[in-house]
UniProtKB/Swiss-Prot annotation:
Composition bias, Basic residues: 1-12, 27-36
Protein name: Der GTPase-activating protein YihI
UniProt keywords, alphabetically: GTPase activation, Ribosome biogenesis
Residue ranges, compositional bias (Acidic residues): 145-172
Biased composition annotated in UniProt, kind: Basic and acidic residues: 13-26, 183-192
Family under the similarity heading: Belongs to the YihI family.
Entry annotated with the keyword Transport: no
One MF annotation (Gene Ontology) recorded for this entry: GTPase activator activity
InterPro entries to which the protein is assigned, alphabetical: YihI
Region span, Disordered: 1-87, 145-192
NCBIfam families: PRK05244.1-1
Subunit (UniProt): Interacts with Der.
Amino acid sequence: MSAKQPNRKPAGKRKESDASAQEGRERKRAAKRKGLKAGSRQQVEQAGKKSGTKQAKDPRIGSRKPVALIVEEKSSKPVAPKQIKEKKLVMTPEQELASIENDDRLNDLLDRLDAGETLEATEQAWVDQRVDRYQELMDELGIIDTDDDEDEADFDEADFDEPGQPASEEELWDRFTQVDYQPEPKPEPKKK
């Protein structure tokens, strides 16, 4: 049969000390009562009145800084408005050329020059600058200025076919074979 097990203490209630019993009772009372005591709002105000040395706390929330109802003008330095940097508009050469051609001031000054008037130094410098820029743009865009009379004298309409009549294939072939085509010589690569 089985061996006899050692005697165990009976599994009864454990004895409590007086202190732990008292703590248990307090916890039980606190658990029964939930929330604040009745009339706690009024009791808080009364507690504030009892301490007469302290100033009564204002229950309102917010700033206690006084607000000026009348606007007073300050006699300080006027603030200079910030200078906004104007971005230069980047224009294409075609747009810039068109703006120079349509410039009323430039056209008026050029008309005065053509009439034989003399311009002030600043106006003359400005006109020269704009005309130079106009020439630069014309060269950059590859536009030939048709206002020159010398170029028109060299132009002979008889040398060109009328645009309405296409050349025959034989004429085109003759023109092609008569052209002396000599390709440009290629530079020799440098030897190291």
